[in-house]
């Protein structure tokens, strides 16, 4: 086990999230003997995996999570899915009895090979083993995808103790070179973009924001920026309001997407716009479309350097004047409906704008934030946590905000119910104020636009939950405040700097 910890340290793994398990004790003894490694203890396997995913996103380093026995490891599959599509290097470790493994039906023994399918390929390792047999974790995690390490151990063996006090953790693996040809993109920018180009910016890592901001300011084209890009407020003057309406009325000949797959409603509409050519610069490598498009996979900074100088293109289709009119209509709406969900999200965004970390934990939360949140103060670090589903949102938020003095999260009520074990992690976190605003959306009713004229379908699809958020908050030792108007947010002005606070947003 000591050689395994050393192997992981060479891959840049400085944090281990550990679940209790029948065969995990030797590994945990080795981790306890290594002061260079930080260990988190989480009882729930799903919460542990999502917390580890949050730590990967917060640190930019690979993080290991150790599963419990038997079928408990399967609870980590949703986190593996999120890590795969977000391209985050998560190492999932499962421990199996070499003498009585999966396939026997013995208590606590399940087939672990290929447990996570394509989302985390399995690497098998039988311990103890020679150093030469240890896997190249650094190389396998360098691509940025999750990996499943299946350990097979002798349950009766006694592991000798070793001195781990001098072990150091290496820097994370270097990012591989970008993949894809820049020829078509370069020709479009230099010779055709003046016909009409829109820049769509999805979620970005903090290190990606500066080169993408340079690109947007150089091109000077209309922008559709997700809140999770971190550039929505910086590029406010170029951002399109009600983008889906404006761009459907005046389809652009070219769209350049940078970052993750955009959350804008206009993005899926591109499936039915074959005359619009789509180019993507993305770290994940996923096109986000079933139709043909040009994808360049890699870090934006590498790609911008290879692309060289780009021209000033401007608003060739005159989209921004229509956007300013839409912005005016939005402001009128907020003034007329000050107790509506959009108005309360606007007020919440003003309080959250100065936090070190802001997270959005449901599609409804992201849609409201992207359209109605404040535009004046740049949000330093904003994440969407629900891209592949709303499971594990609170655990991921706590992992992301573990080192933050102030962190805010906006989620739906179902996301809270699906991650009720998350706050058990709180006693291990450094001091800080964590504010979780919960949108009361009647069991996802507000997210189902297609049920407005079909009450029976609404009855079948909606899942209203009879629960009181205040009771859950009390279970976790948190304060809970109902929010009906903008003035109700004043409770945050007097709240402790080290507290977990729930805000139950109850719009008209």
Task: Enumerate the language-model features and the residues they cover.
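Glycine-rich, acidic loop regions that bind phosphate or pyrophosphate groups
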Residues: 83, 93-137, 225-322, 426, ...
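Structural motif
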Residues: 19-21, 68, 127-129, 150-153, ...
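Phosphate/pyrophosphate-binding active-site segments
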Residues: 270-364, 468-472, 477-508
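Structural signature of the thiamine diphosphate
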Residues: 4, 12-15, 59-67, 73, ...
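Glycine-rich, anion-gripping cofactor-binding loops and their flanking helix/strand elements
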Residues: 57-58, 68-69, 75, 200-281, ...
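Active-site diphosphate/adenylate-binding microenvironment
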Residues: 4-14, 19-32, 323-404
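Thiamine diphosphate
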Residues: 83, 93, 98-113, 119, ...
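N-terminal cofactor/phosphate-binding cores enriched in small/glycine residues
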Residues: 1-66, 71-74
């Amino acid at each position: 086990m000591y050689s395994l910890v050393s192997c992981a340290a060479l891959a840049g793994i400085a944090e281990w999230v550990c679940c209790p398990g029948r065969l995990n004790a030797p590994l945990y003894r080795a981790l306890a003997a290594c002061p260079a490694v930080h260990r988190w203890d989480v009882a729930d396997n799903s919460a542990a995996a999502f917390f580890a995913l949050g730590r990967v996103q917060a640190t930019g380093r690979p993080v290991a999570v150790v599963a419990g026995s038997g079928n408990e490891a399967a609870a980590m599959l949703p986190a593996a899915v999120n890590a795969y599509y977000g391209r985050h290097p998560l190492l999932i470790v499962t421990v199996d009895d070499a003498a009585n493994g999966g396939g026997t039906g013995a208590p606590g023994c399940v087939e672990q090979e290929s447990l996570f399918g394509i989302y985390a390929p399995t690497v098998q390792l039988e311990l103890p083993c020679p150093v030469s047999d240890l896997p190249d974790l650094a190389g396998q995690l360098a691509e940025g995808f999750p990996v499943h390490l299946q350990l097979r151990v002798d349950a009766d063996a006694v592991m000798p103790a070793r001195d781990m006090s001098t072990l150091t953790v290496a820097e994370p693996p270097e990012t591989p070179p970008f993949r894809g040809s820049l020829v078509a993109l370069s020709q479009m920018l230099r010779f055709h973009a003046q016909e009409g180009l829109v820049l769509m910016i999805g979620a970005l890592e903090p290190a990606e924001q500066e080169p993408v901001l340079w690109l947007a300011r150089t091109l000077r084209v209309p922008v559709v920026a997700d809140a999770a890009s971190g550039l929505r407020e910086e590029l406010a003057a170029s951002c399109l309001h009600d983008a889906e309406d404006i761009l459907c009325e005046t389809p652009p000949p070219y769209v350049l997407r940078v970052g993750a797959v955009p959350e804008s409603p206009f993005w899926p509409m591109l499936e039915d716009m074959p005359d619009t050519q789509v180019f993507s610069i993305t770290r994940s490598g996923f096109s986000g479309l079933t139709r043909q498009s040009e994808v360049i996979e890699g870090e934006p900074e590498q790609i911008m350097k290879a692309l060289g100088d780009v021209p000033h293109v401007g608003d060739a289709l005159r989209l921004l004047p229509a956007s300013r009119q839409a912005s005016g209509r939005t402001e009128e709406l907020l003034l007329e409906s000050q107790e509506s969900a959009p108005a309360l999200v606007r007020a919440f965004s003003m309080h959250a704008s100065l936090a070190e970390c802001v997270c959005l934990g449901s599609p409804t939360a992201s849609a409201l934030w992207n359209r109605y949140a404040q535009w004046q103060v740049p949000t330093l670090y904003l994440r969407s946590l629900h891209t592949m589903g709303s499971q594990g949102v609170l655990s991921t938020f706590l992992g992301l905000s573990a080192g933050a003095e102030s962190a805010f999260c906006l989620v739906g009520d179902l996301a809270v119910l699906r991650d009720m074990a998350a706050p058990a992690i709180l006693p291990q976190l450094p001091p800080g104020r964590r504010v979780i605003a919960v949108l009361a959306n009647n069991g996802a009713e507000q997210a189902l636009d297609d049920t407005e004229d079909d009450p029976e379908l609404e009855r079948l699809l909606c899942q209203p939950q009879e629960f009181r958020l205040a009771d859950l908050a009390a279970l976790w030792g948190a304060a809970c405040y109902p929010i009906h108007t903008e003035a109700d947010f004043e409770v945050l002005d007097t709240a402790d700097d080290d507290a977990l606070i729930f805000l139950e947003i109850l719009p008209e």
